[in-house]
């Protein structure tokens, strides 16, 4: 049996086409979704991510605003910029590109963003609402992962989901989202003693650890859905995931590739959250 490849780029394009239609309808009502992205410093990777977000906004018809600030900016000045955007009716979503310079406390910055504009889903209020199953902006990568699993038409309810990794950005929230879908969830991490045995119990395996090709066929239950969140660059310059794709291909039922797997879904869910925020605000642009 060879696994079915879940092509995240194709799923993302399909969802972006749906978002484009929604944005057209909103604009007919005088509502223009708007996303502001704050970029501090000149980190090339961050700039590349921001460019992808701008391109996504342009594709679906979202107004985007890039605020570029020097690496030397004070925390107070950055907080003031967020306050300005919180009060700007043209802006439905605010995203601060991480990481930030060491002299700025990320927690304080994230908490300053209005929960109504927290399209990244990182604000403590958003996290609390997610934990209790309330309507909120879901974190983009975890939300994208759940959407990819749903593409397999597998009934998530009652399935055993194993999450390898416990970061605040992916591991912890993705487990909670699957719990909200009535799955049974097990977390594995660096201190887990029997990771291989646990991962072999997974109907759905989510891997987000940042270690190239760590997960091999002997970690996989036959027919499992395998979602590889890792993006690692080998010495050859080639990108690979945390899962040894070729090794696992004959055991898994479904698998995401790297690249063109989870990555394209992250920005797509950010666009989704921005459109949802615009719908909730319902502010007609003059």
UniProtKB/Swiss-Prot annotation:
Gene Ontology CC: cytosol
Organism domain of life: Bacteria
EC number, UniProt record: 1.5.1.5, 3.5.4.9
Pathway, per record: One-carbon metabolism; tetrahydrofolate interconversion
Residues annotated as binding NADP(+): 165-167, 190, 231
Protein task: Catalyzes the oxidation of 5,10-methylenetetrahydrofolate to 5,10-methenyltetrahydrofolate and then the hydrolysis of 5,10-methenyltetrahydrofolate to 10-formyltetrahydrofolate.
Self-association state and partner proteins as the record states: Homodimer.
Family that this chain belongs to: Belongs to the tetrahydrofolate dehydrogenase/cyclohydrolase family.
Protein name listed in UniProt: Bifunctional protein FolD
Organism for this UniProt entry: Bacillus cereus (strain ATCC 14579 / DSM 31 / CCUG 7414 / JCM 2152 / NBRC 15305 / NCIMB 9373 / NCTC 2599 / NRRL B-3711)
